[in-house]
């Protein structure tokens, strides 16, 4: 009788594991892949997020690691896609860039907070005069993007930054914006971005050819603070979340996700609860402020042929309507 009870108990544990893998979309291996082996646990919260149904691989590790990025790319098909959605033909570029970085780990608080509340802070003018700074700083993880400053805007957007996504044309070069507690995440859109990273890390003169505007000629962050975002995250944002076509008609320029949507996709992989701020744009008032900083207006957005902002706004509206995310700047 005792053996029968033990057998039922062990069977229950096995069934729980199988159901857990199905619900969370894990890779199904008995032992995790290399990209899952981080000093910090990406998913150690048993509370299923409201957005879980959006992701095929919720436990996907978001940063590239030199030791296993080729294996990870083969596992998830990233080796079949060109930039910005894969590593195809540019594996050596990624390997060279990763060889100069000291770490691919997540940050320390991931060990201490089991269910992480995150806020993704956009740069939209809707943040002006909202005084959300204290609210934003109360989250476990704060994700920002590009050169959206906190210096001088603390009352509106807070002081803390956990992750800041950037590309060479958008990263800070003024040391007054340096934050030792920020992890700076390079989003690679083109081969020149990886060349730039190599040149800037080894102190070589920066080749500015191939950029849509002059990239930063120096980096305010230390090597230990820099990560490279896995292109799978960008691919997921484009094809799975925004439903962009794999091939655009010849008479149309291909559209790619904005850094904001990419940052949101990153949050879905490392957070249990996601809130947004600064993602609402007023397309009907061209003279309204584009950002919470500077003097740019919404009229500039009409000239942008690289992104599909209408599709992104509809996607965000749907997420908010279904309560998959909470919008702090709804009104």
Curated annotation (Swiss-Prot):
Question: InterPro entries from the entry?
Answer: Glyco_trans_29 (IPR001675), Glycosyltransferase_29 (IPR051142), GT29-like_sf (IPR038578), Sialyl_trans (IPR012163)
Q: Origin, by domain of life?
A: Eukaryota
- What biological-process terms (Gene Ontology) are attached? cellular response to interleukin-6; glycolipid biosynthetic process; protein glycosylation
The catalytic activity, as recorded, is: a neolactoside nLc4Cer(d18:1(4E)) + CMP-N-acetyl-beta-neuraminate = a neolactoside IV(3)-alpha-NeuAc-nLc4Cer(d18:1(4E)) + CMP + H(+); a beta-D-galactosyl-(1->4)-N-acetyl-beta-D-glucosaminyl derivative + CMP-N-acetyl-beta-neuraminate = an N-acetyl-alpha-neuraminyl-(2->3)-beta-D-galactosyl-(1->4)-N-acetyl-beta-D-glucosaminyl derivative + CMP + H(+); a neolactoside nLc6Cer(d18:1(4E)) + CMP-N-acetyl-beta-neuraminate = a neolactoside VI(3)-alpha-NeuNAc-nLc6Cer(d18:1(4E)) + CMP + H(+)
Its Gene Ontology cellular component terms are: Golgi membrane
Keyword Transmembrane helix assigned to the entry: answer is yes
Q: What is its main location?
A: Golgi
- Span-the-membrane segments of this chain are 5-25
Q: How does it sit in the membrane?
A: Single-pass type II membrane protein
Q: Does the keyword Ribosomal protein apply?
A: no
Q: Which organism is it from?
A: Rattus norvegicus
Similarity comment: Belongs to the glycosyltransferase 29 family.
The record ties this protein, via PANTHER family, to: SIALYLTRANSFERASE, TYPE 2 LACTOSAMINE ALPHA-2,3-SIALYLTRANSFERASE
Pfam families the record matches:
Glyco_transf_29
Query: Which keywords annotate this record?
Result: Glycoprotein, Glycosyltransferase, Golgi apparatus, Membrane, Signal-anchor, Transferase, Transmembrane, Transmembrane helix
- Topological domain ranges for the Lumenal compartment: 26-331
Q: Where in the cell is it found?
A: Golgi apparatus membrane
UniProt enzyme class: transferase
EC identifiers of the protein: 2.4.3.6
Task: Report the protein name in the record.
Answer: Type 2 lactosamine alpha-2,3-sialyltransferase
What GO MF annotations does this protein's record show? N-acetyllactosaminide alpha-2,3-sialyltransferase activity; sialyltransferase activity
> Which sequence ranges are listed under topological domain Cytoplasmic?
1-4
Question: What gene is it encoded by?
Answer: St3gal6
- Carbohydrate attachment sites? 129, 181, 295, 308, 327
What function does this protein fulfil? Transfers the sialyl residue from CMP-N-acetyl-beta-neuraminate to the terminal galactose residue on sugar chains of glycoproteins and glycolipids. It's alpha-2,3-sialyltransferase activity is specific toward type II glycan chains (Galbeta1-4GlcNAc) on glycoproteins and glycolipids such as neolactosides nLc4Cer and nLc6Cer, whose sialyl-products serve as precursors for the Lewis X antigen. Critically involved in the synthesis of functional selectin ligands needed for neutrophil recruitment during inflammation and lymphocyte homing to the lymph nodes.
């Amino acid at each position: 009788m005792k053996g029968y009870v033990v057998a039922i108990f062990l069977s229950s544990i096995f069934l729980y594991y199988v159901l857990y893998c199905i619900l969370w979309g894990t890779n199904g291996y008995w032992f995790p892949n290399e990209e899952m082996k981080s000093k910090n646990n990406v998913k150690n919260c048993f509370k299923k997020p409201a957005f879980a149904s959006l992701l095929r691989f919720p436990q996907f590790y978001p940063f590239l690691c030199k030791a296993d990025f080729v294996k990870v790319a083969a596992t998830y098909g990233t080796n079949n896609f060109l930039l910005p959605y894969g590593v195809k033909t540019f594996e050596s570029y990624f390997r060279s860039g990763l060889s100069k970085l000291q770490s691919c780990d997540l940050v320390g608080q991931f060990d201490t907070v089991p269910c992480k509340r995150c806020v993704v802070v956009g740069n939209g003018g809707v943040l002006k005069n909202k005084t959300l700074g204290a609210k934003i700083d109360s989250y476990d993880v704060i994700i920002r993007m590009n050169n959206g400053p906190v210096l001088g805007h603390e009352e509106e957007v807070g002081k803390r930054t956990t992750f800041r996504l950037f590309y060479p044309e958008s990263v800070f070069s003024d040391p007054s914006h340096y934050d030792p507690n920020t992890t700076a995440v390079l989003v690679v859109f083109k081969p020149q971005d990886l060349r730039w990273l190599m040149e800037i890390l080894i102190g070589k003169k920066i080749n500015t050819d191939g950029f849509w505007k002059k990239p930063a000629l120096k980096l305010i962050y230390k090597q230990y603070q820099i990560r490279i975002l896995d292109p799978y995250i960008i691919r997921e944002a484009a094809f799975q979340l925004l439903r962009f076509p794999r091939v655009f008609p010849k008479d149309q320029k291909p559209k790619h996700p904005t850094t904001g949507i990419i940052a949101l996709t990153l949050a879905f992989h490392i957070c249990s609860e996601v809130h947004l701020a600064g993602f609402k744009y007023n397309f009907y008032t061209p003279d309204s402020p584009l950002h919470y900083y500077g003097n740019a207006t919404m009229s500039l957005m009409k000239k942008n042929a690289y992104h599909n902002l209408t599709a992104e706004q509809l996607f965000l509206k749907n997420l908010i309507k279904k309560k998959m995310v909470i919008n702090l700047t709804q009104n």
